[in-house]
């Protein structure tokens, strides 16, 4: 690996150290992380199977849930195998290109998940506020366009981050990344060159995706609450609100974890590094773990079909 004035020029590989300060207990940390991964994959796979084979669930609300489940599986799978390789098998090395590819996948799937949550909020808004137009607006073609749109938005907005790293950052102080996966700022901060453009673009993407989605999700639910509370019958209000509970829970835990991780990383300079890394890991691992549980508990149709799958023979 060529060096120049003490810096590394165009490194061929990086070293991921995992969770700095907790190297001695990483093998134990990997146990709950792997358990969350397995539960998340099984739970989300079960939701996908139920929605695929149950024709009554082939409606926008559950199609978006299937998109969310598939995204959760993909996001977790981008992170955990390599993380466990570091924690359990002492395999910290990752090639430069593989690291950038992992970074692109992780941030793209995060953006896709945010876009799906926005689509789910808009679906509930139309279903509750203008129900007579729901079937017309959320046609099969429109659902396909939404899926392609959130995917392309994520991929296109994240790609320039790779170009800025690959083409503009040539010299690195070290090849050791103090993280358990390849995260954008963790890589950028290793460079000796001016990284202001990278930082600005990173903030632009965060606000263009998360900021945009949060604003419109919030506006959707403000209008939903206004409409629900104007319903004359208490039973009708409860029924309408009940269709939103699971999505509200998923929305809150996804964005609260995201912003908590974001602000502690940028403004919590006095917080130990291992706290930052643990929060980043939890932000990515907890939503895919909790989402199928939340929807399994809070959504009657999903809950009934899970009971049918596991206890059908006993019931009959």
Curated annotation (Swiss-Prot):
One of its GO terms (molecular function) is G protein-coupled receptor activity. Odorant receptor. Glycans are attached at residue 5. One of its GO terms (biological process) is sensory perception of smell. It is found in: Cell membrane. The keyword Glycoprotein applies. It comes from Homo sapiens. It comes from the Eukaryota. The keyword Cell membrane applies. This is Olfactory receptor 52A5. GO terms for cellular component: membrane; plasma membrane. InterPro entries: GPCR_Rhodpsn, GPCR_Rhodpsn_7TM, Olfact_rcpt, OR51/52/56-like. Residues 1-27, 78-101, 163-199, 262-276 are extracellular. The gene is OR52A5. Keywords: Cell membrane, G-protein coupled receptor, Glycoprotein, Membrane, Olfaction, Receptor, Sensory transduction, Transducer, Transmembrane, Transmembrane helix. Residues 49-56, 123-141, 221-240, 298-316 are cytoplasmic. CDD domains: 7tmA_OR52A-like. PANTHER family: OLFACTORY RECEPTOR 52A5, OLFACTORY RECEPTOR 56B1-RELATED. It is a multi-pass membrane protein. The chain crosses the membrane at residues 28-48, 57-77, 102-122, 142-162, 200-220, 241-261, 277-297. Belongs to the G-protein coupled receptor 1 family.
